[in-house]
């Protein structure tokens, strides 16, 4: 089964050709350098760039002499995401579908992230997945490949969102996640005196997340230093490292709670754009002594067409088995 997957939910235009369990082609054009000057993604600008970038990707695809007659379906991200970029992706997918007479399959972006763990790996069910991205933070429990349940979700900000906001407050630039993680990697964290930011409280659903309080703590602390002329590069490092340390503790707490709730878990996966974070990846690997741990390559953590194609493949096989 061969699927062409198209992802345009945010600022990455990505197209992949996925055959059975192999990514034959993955072409992605990112816009983060364009949006960096604005401190975040500008939807109208993103839509315009997607139109240009998808044309470039199509030209590259055609240059690879792909036999479109062998493709079984064309999949695209339907939602969630920015309306303009999603529409551009839909129009692009629809045009290919009509021209090559192939079925069109709409795919949920978050479902794509979940299945990104299966692009190069076999998942042993039941699976507990931590999905962390710029717009979402979720714990997903899958009893089997056809039965997925969101057991925990953020009630306010997503993790990637607060990384960006705190990165902006510290003057690190956009996107904040990779910038803060780089600070972590470049400093001797073990011997550093850390700031004691408090962990978020347990919510009505203990598996839900709340990051707004932590965000407020960190930004208020930073602003107080600025107002008293005590803000320095040394403080930027201390705040960034202390923030990430608190995030790691919080994610571990939530994962441990989920594993106590779902006692039959065999596999833990880490997916989504923030899954590229080096220390969060290390955290998930600490569970390897009891569970199978699957973390996709970084190219499959960020938004990509391969995860959309993989989700479509699962969908088609499920329908065939009915």
Curated annotation (Swiss-Prot):
GO terms for biological process: tRNA threonylcarbamoyladenosine modification. It is found in: Cytoplasm. The keyword Mitochondrion does not apply. Binds 1 Fe(2+) ion per subunit. Keywords: Acyltransferase, Cytoplasm, Iron, Metal-binding, Transferase, tRNA processing. One of its GO terms (molecular function) is iron ion binding. Substrate binds at residues 131-135, 164, 177, 181, 277. It catalyses: L-threonylcarbamoyladenylate + adenosine(37) in tRNA = N(6)-L-threonylcarbamoyladenosine(37) in tRNA + AMP + H(+). Its cofactor is Fe(2+). InterPro entries: ATPase_NBD (IPR043129), Gcp-like_dom (IPR000905), KAE1/TsaD (IPR017861), TsaD (IPR022450). Fe cation binds at residues 109, 113, 303. SUPFAM superfamilies: Actin-like ATPase domain. Its EC number is 2.3.1.234. It comes from the Bacteria. One of its GO terms (cellular component) is cytoplasm. Required for the formation of a threonylcarbamoyl group on adenosine at position 37 (t(6)A37) in tRNAs that read codons beginning with adenine. Is involved in the transfer of the threonylcarbamoyl moiety of threonylcarbamoyl-AMP (TC-AMP) to the N6 group of A37, together with TsaE and TsaB. TsaD likely plays a direct catalytic role in this reaction. HAMAP family: TsaD. Belongs to the KAE1 / TsaD family. This is tRNA N6-adenosine threonylcarbamoyltransferase. It comes from Mesomycoplasma hyopneumoniae (strain 7448).
